[in-house]
């Protein structure tokens, strides 16, 4: 009982701060809040959501590069992958969500060894290499590798 009174008090305070003058429930179950300016808060929120959606739809390659600064293909993470085998194997697991073409494009010929390692070791070994990601010295392969992908001089 005491916690529901606190909750109700918090709701009333929130409504007062936002100048809400009336609260009504519509037939579809949504709650509409009328403000002193006469505009429904629900309509305003819907309008703001559509603006955000339209901004999100106009993304450029610059936006994508900014995300990559903190993402899977950030230069700092790629350098760390070159130094740490266990970190590299964890990141390879996250690369499975992308196509090989996309990964190759993101690496931009700066990290060809990572791509070759991803294709020749991680993809060929499957779950066996993931099982030993914390101790890469214990990795064993049960299947023979049937094909290798090599970098060319072109």
UniProtKB/Swiss-Prot annotation:
Keywords recorded for this protein, A-Z: Host nucleus, Secreted, Signal, Virulence
Record comment regarding domains: The RxLR-dEER motif acts to carry the protein into the host cell cytoplasm through binding to cell surface phosphatidylinositol-3-phosphate.
Source species: Phytophthora infestans (strain T30-4)
UniProt record similarity statement: Belongs to the RxLR effector family.
Motif (PP1c-binding motif): 138
Full protein name: RxLR effector protein PexRD24
Protein's cellular compartments: Secreted; Host nucleus, Host nucleoplasm; Host nucleus, Host nucleolus
Source organism, top-level taxon: Eukaryota
Endpoints of the signal sequence: 1-22
Described purpose of this protein according to its UniProt entry: Effector that interacts with isoforms of host protein phosphatase type 1c (PP1c), mimicking a regulatory subunit and causing their re-localization within the host nucleus. The holoenzymes formed with PP1c isoforms act to promote late blight by attenuating jasmonic acid (JA)- and salicylic acid (SA)-mediated transcriptional responses of the host plant.
GO CC entries: extracellular region; host cell nucleolus; host cell nucleoplasm
Record keyword Signal present: yes
Major place of residence: secreted
Subunit structure as annotated in this protein's UniProt entry: Interacts with the potato PP1c family proteins PP1c-1, PP1c-2 and PP1c-3.
Renumbered ranges of motif RxLR-dEER: 53-67
Signals that turn on the gene: Expression is up-regulated during the biotrophic phase of infection on potato plants.
